[in-house]
Design a protein with these regions (language model features):
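Unchanged
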Residues: 1-254, 365
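Left-handed beta-helix
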Residues: 1-10, 199, 209-371
């Protein structure tokens, strides 16, 4: 691979997942039972032989720091590789100033010391698989200044409303990067993933700071569409943008479909995560499990259908869990019916026997809550 280092960026101020983000950033969200969302961009980089990675964190860093740690579990070469956790030194009470550009400026010394000629930037809040080696080769062969990754969708009126979309010409040149206003169903969703020369990246950061304290990297790239050669490359396969509560729930539910899961997980493309040495899940005689993902360390006595169950959960006898995402160490008591819910860590559903939300508007049970 051409020498490139990786940046895993944090979510912007326009992105917020109600309830769950009160406790941790999106990158630290539990995903499909055993993973965290941030495992996907980091694994994509290490599988692509990118072994120098910077992970940027804006706020509530504890969960990300605990999970990512030194990065050893991501198969990073311990001699030549390194994973850095970098923070915004001047986190402002006024959120309009907490941009990715301000975070990069706070860590300009670390950026300036990177000797790699190219940088690959990917978000901590999107789930997909990609070979960044091939992505970088495509960029270099094209002669473009910047190459952006996009995913073509046909439901942009209802989904991806907090994402940006690309305006492309017939040669896949990027003419604009604008918010998705939900007025067209067919759009090219920008995956907040790009590649460029490190020298250009640093110059764009400095120029963005001079133009506006509110500017993001996307803003300055949009300004440069007329003067730089910016091109788009299409992504194929499973793609989820976790930018609000419905999209988090939908992403977990979508991967219960085996065909969708095959588009994300490949035999030769492992998704690394921090291991947890817990015992296998116990299924009792009364257990009835259908089309679900069950993590290690659980005790299942009740019925589980079309659901994702995190590590160490307890589903008591007579309990029914349908179309739900249950995070680690939660308990569903005897005779409790849970449907269309996201249940956060350590919650205990024991007294209220019917906890059901509408299919089109899944509910949320807070962390460490008792119902």
């Amino acid at each position: 691979m051409y020498k490139a280092f990786g940046i895993v960026s944090s979510s912007g101020r326009n992105i917020y997942v109600d309830g769950m983000q009160d406790y941790r950033p999106i990158g630290a969200f539990s995903f499909l039972g055993r993973y965290r969302v941030i495992d996907f961009p980091i694994s994509n980089m290490t599988n692509s032989d990118i072994d120098r990675i910077q992970v940027y964190i804006n706020n509530k860093p504890r969960s990300v720091v605990e999970h990512v740690g030194t990065g050893r579990h991501y198969n990073i070469n311990s001699k030549s590789g390194k994973l850095q956790l970098l923070f915004s030194e001047h986190n402002n009470d006024n959120d309009i100033y907490n941009t990715d550009i301000s975070c990069y400026l706070d860590n300009m010394e670390s950026l300036s010391r990177m000797y790699h000629p190219y940088v690959v930037i990917a978000p901590s809040y999107m789930v997909y698989s990609i070979d960044f080696d091939q992505f970088l080769h495509t960029h270099i062969d094209s002669g473009a200044d910047v190459t952006l990754l996009y995913h073509a969708v046909d439901n942009a009126k209802e989904a991806y409303l907090t994402c940006n979309v690309l305006g492309l010409n017939r040669q896949k040149g990027v003419e604009s990067i604008e918010p998705n206003h939900g007025n067209k169903k067919n759009q090219y969703v920008y995956m907040d993933t790009c590649v460029m020369k490190t020298e250009l990246f640093i110059s764009l950061i400095k120029e963005a700071k001079n133009l506006s304290s509110m500017y993001t990297l996307t803003d300055i790239l949009n300004d440069k569409c007329e003067t730089l050669d910016i091109r788009g490359v299409a992504h194929k396969g499973f793609f989820a943008s976790i930018t609000d509560f419905p999209s988090y729930y939908a992403a977990n539910m979508a991967l219960l479909n085996y065909k969708s899961a095959q588009e994300l997980f490949h035999d030769n493309w492992p998704i690394y995560t921090r291991t947890n040495d817990s015992c296998p899940t116990q299924y009792f005689n009364t257990a009835d499990v259908k089309n679900s993902v069950i993590s290690n360390g659980c005790q299942i006595e009740g019925t589980v259908e079309n659901s994702v169950i995190g590590r160490g959960c307890v589903i008591k006898k007579g309990a029914v869990v349908r179309n739900s995402v249950i995070l680690a160490e939660a308990t569903v008591g005897e005779g409790v019916h849970v449907e269309n819910e996201v249940v956060d860590k350590w919650a205990k559903l024991v007294h209220k026997k019917e906890i059901v939300s509408p299919t089109e508007q899944p509910g949320y049970i807070r962390r460490n809550d008792t119902l």
